[in-house]
Amino acid sequence: MPGSVPFATPHAPLARHAGGWGFFVQMFGYGKSNECRGVRMGTPTPIQPTVWVGRVRRFFPLRWATWTSTEGVIMSEKIRNVALVGQGGVGKTMLAEAMLHLSGVTSRLGGHKGTKPTLDYDPEEEKRSFSIKLAMAPVSWGGARLNVIDAPCYPDFIGDAYAAMSAVETAIFVVDAAGDPGAVTTRLWYAAEDLSLARAVFVNRIDRSEAQYDATLAALQERFGQRLGAVTLPWGVGEDFKGIIDVIRMKARHLDDAGKPVECDIPAEYADAAEEARARLCELVVEADDELMLKYLEGDGQLTQEELEGLLAKAIAERIFVPVFAGSCTAEEGVTSLMDDIATYFPSASDFGSVPLVNGDYLDIDEGDDRPVAFVFKVLNDPQNGRLALAKVLAGTVKPGLELICARTRKPERLAHIYRMVGRDMSEVPSAAAGDIVVVPKIAAMAGDTLSVTGKVEAAAFRFPNSLYQVAIEPDKRGTEDKLYSFLEKSCDADPTMSVSRNEDTGQTVISAIGEAQVSVLLDRMAARAGVTAHIVPMRVPYRETIRRTASAQGRHKKQTGGAGQYGDCWLRLEPNPGAGYEFVDEVVGGRIPKGLIPAVDKGVQETMREGVVAGYPMIDVRVACYDGSYHSVDSNEMAFKSAARLGFLKAAGQAEPVVLEPMAKLMVTVPEDYAGSIMGDVSASRGRVEGMEAGERGTTVIQARVPYAEVVDYATRLRSLSRGTGEFTLEIDGYEQVPYDVQAKLAEEWQNRRNAGR
């Protein structure tokens, strides 16, 4: 376009402002000499003011300090770790693909117009057309390394978004210019807030006819607050979309025919909108500096270009300001501006200062520390590359061959090789400094583990979403149970949001996950990689049986076969024993039953109780007294008295008003207050009762209820539907209660049908 000039090439550092990133100081030192570990300072570095933000300490330099690495290692202050998160299907992966392409890492825009994606390489992702795992997309831009993590945000795979956010300093939320921010975006927004992350928003798909940038920005401000402000505006929308208006630099920007970023003067028709957006930007960021704010308020409400750029980094890192960008990932417009600002204004790894430890202390993010520490935030089981641990270096420098100790296991882990990963492709690196993210193959560490020289350093764990979706599975082919369980255990070790267990009460193999799609992917992978197929079966509820009144009966077993016979005779009294479990009492006197045969009576009773008398479920809370009987000196033996005890117990239990008990669940549901009525109605319809309700955080309502477990086996799926994906819940078994008689009759009928069918 006329007047356009080249702007910034991917590898050309942008001009730094006076308040740009400088070298950080140690936690307990207010400054260092010019000769620092691995760094030679070109100019003296002033004392750095320290600012506490949420859970971390951040450092903000007073002026830019030049430096040179003596080892050729990318230093911590030049590393930007960012996670792309947001609602599923809004273009997060395409944004990462655009970053890879524009920075020269890839030669074409992956996943667009039939090209093979770089990041969604898993066959299950190709099959489902959405991301199911996080992927790394590191790029070099503007003199910095941008470690970009593309996080899946389909609800069932949201655990990887939490893992990604635990390893970064900034969360970039991608939203659709024509859609609602969505429940997942809201959930992750508050998770990022709890982690004290800087945040930014990229409004995608401006080139679509239905795009409404202003309305989208207003919706974001209404939901997340007025600290959000535009740093780029769309230069047209729909078919008229040409590029973006850079509010910081007050220039229009677009890609030329060769795909290179260029800038020009702002078109006249956008001048007023740009001035208005800039005024709003100044108003927001000036809160980061009290002196400049006073000057701003007492003056004409303007900031110089130098003052504005000097405040941006501090305002973003302190979460005073959330920058909002406009663009189109498929057109690749607006993406270079985003990368420029990430490199220039977004917090670096060193700006987080320190990370909290389990013991309450803090660990400096210090590349000069001679005791390296690494934090594993994700494990991948890749069929091509094997087990891969994605780790963030928290302190020191890691190199191939280094041996560190895992804080959880106290076992050494040898980092034979370290790699950088782009999608599935890996390239070995000679070292990585504090703040950098690397891939380490073939170590046993799990997500959340901390590796250090002593094994005594343990970073505070981040909380994954609750995995309350449960299903029971069975192999399609008998004899493959062990192979099935082995594959599931290995897979769940790599994914903290999933677990597999054998239910001792029901004997079923149970998978716990976030949602149905997550289990479906797991089973498909098992079939493809292990050759074991399985199917989902109904979850069995661990019902119990008991009695409601006292009853007595005789059990007499007599069998004559021509030789030695069998004879056993006992009288049993059954009594309710609420909350005390099973108890057996020997009340026989006068040698009516020899002492050596009394244990056989006890054993016969317990074996019968395991089978139940009403619906085939184990009996609990019964006191059994054996108070009389008789025996034969020749024909009485252990087997005979076990059989007699069985007969006596069945008779007495039938007279003692046997009932079925069902497990009760203590349910706590957190939903936006608009959905509270639906949740309470569902609890009532599920034979439950609401026991309490209170206001929660961020406009939510917390509902406490007690519900039969049988009614909430599928509650994860039901709550997602009731709350449109906005609800969360916890559930725990909380005792047993008698089932209604109609439910008991149904269970008894099902048991009888199974017996008649020989099952």
Predicted regions: what they are:
Residues 18-19, 243:
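Coil-to-alpha-helix initiation sites in intrinsically disordered, low-complexity, charged segments
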Residues 5, 12-15, 43-44, 48, ...:
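Short, low-complexity intrinsically disordered segments enriched in A/P/G/S/L with frequent Arg
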Residues 21, 28-30, 46, 53-56:
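Low-complexity, intrinsically disordered Ser/Thr/Pro- and acidic-rich segments
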Residues 5-8, 12, 18, 25, ...:
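Short hydrophobic alpha-helical segments enriched in small aliphatic residues
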Residues 34-37, 48, 59, 63-759:
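Structural and coupling elements of P-loop NTPases
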Residues 3-4, 38-40:
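N-terminal, intrinsically disordered charge-dense segments
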